[in-house]
Amino acid sequence: MADSSAPGRPLRSVCVYCGSSNTTKPEYLDLATRFGQALAARKLRMVYGGGAVGLMGRCAKAAHAAGGDVLGIMPRFLERREITYQDVPHRMVETMHERKHMMFEESDAFVVLPGGIGTLEEAVETLSWRRLDLHAKPVVFLSEDDFWAPFFALMQHTVEANLTPANFNDAVAYTRSIEACFAALEGVSAPM
């Protein structure tokens, strides 16, 4: 597993983990749209799961419509369920493991928008790889409400139980605005 996060390397590509449900809160769909636009405005390539539905579809479509570079990575068995977004380049893979590995390899950083169990699985694996020193890429959770608060409370519980190192928070940021998210990606302190 290559790590493209050498100190001083410019941020060029952001992997976005997020939900594929169209029936979630409109606020989450709106956040995904605005985040995609923000990626394009900053000339950052979006790498994501390749779907045209839910937050992932909204984010990719917004980035693409704003002139951004988008790369989707889709396992063949999910083509019908997540409906591959055909307007952007995409790579087809056979397994979820290949998808996650390729998303990792193609990205300089990770942003986690609201999502379900698949989003959590991707985010936790990325954090686990970071904990194992397999990479030093930024991992930033973003929600404008307290969507991720229960996750971070659980992580703090594991720290207090001596199951997760106390420096866990050094490997991840929890932001509540797009501006704070990009500041965290760039290693700059901004209001959360």
Regions found by a protein language model. Name each.
Residues 2-106, 144-192:
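A cross-family phosphate/adenosyl-ligand binding-site feature
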